[in-house]
Amino acid sequence: MPTINQLVRQGREVEVTKSKSPAMQNCPQRRGVCTRVYTTTPKKPNSALRKVAKVRLTNGFEVISYIGGEGHNLQEHSVVLVRGGRVKDLPGVRYHIVRGSLDLQGVKDRKQSRSKYGSKRPKKA
């Protein structure tokens, strides 16, 4: 516990919190162009081929983003919307691509959690 004299001399230092998604620059989403679309493997206990894309954002940052859902139509030069949110088993992947927005289509035949995957409501039979 500091004395009042010590506080007058030094003062309290405010803790600066580091952003988990610095490339967003406090924006909820950012537009970007895919520079490379590829698959990568997750960390130790898991095994899969995760779909990711390297995206050049409008603010000049180049980030690796995860493409969620089953199947996608992304290619190089596709324009996508990027949001924050990391993928725990992929090191360096701190962003997600928004499904059903700009050039990326929603997941086909998705019945549940449709809003997260940009799928339209299925037609009644």
Curated annotation (Swiss-Prot):
The modification 3-methylthioaspartic acid is found at D89. GO terms for molecular function: rRNA binding; structural constituent of ribosome; tRNA binding. Gene3D superfamilies: Nucleic acid-binding proteins (2.40.50.140). Keywords: Methylation, Ribonucleoprotein, Ribosomal protein, RNA-binding, rRNA-binding, tRNA-binding. It holds the Pfam family Ribosom_S12_S23. Residues 104-125 are annotated as: Disordered. One of its GO terms (biological process) is translation. One of its GO terms (cellular component) is small ribosomal subunit. It comes from the Bacteria. With S4 and S5 plays an important role in translational accuracy. Part of the 30S ribosomal subunit. Contacts proteins S8 and S17. May interact with IF1 in the 30S initiation complex. This is Small ribosomal subunit protein uS12. It comes from Leptothrix cholodnii (strain ATCC 51168 / LMG 8142 / SP-6).
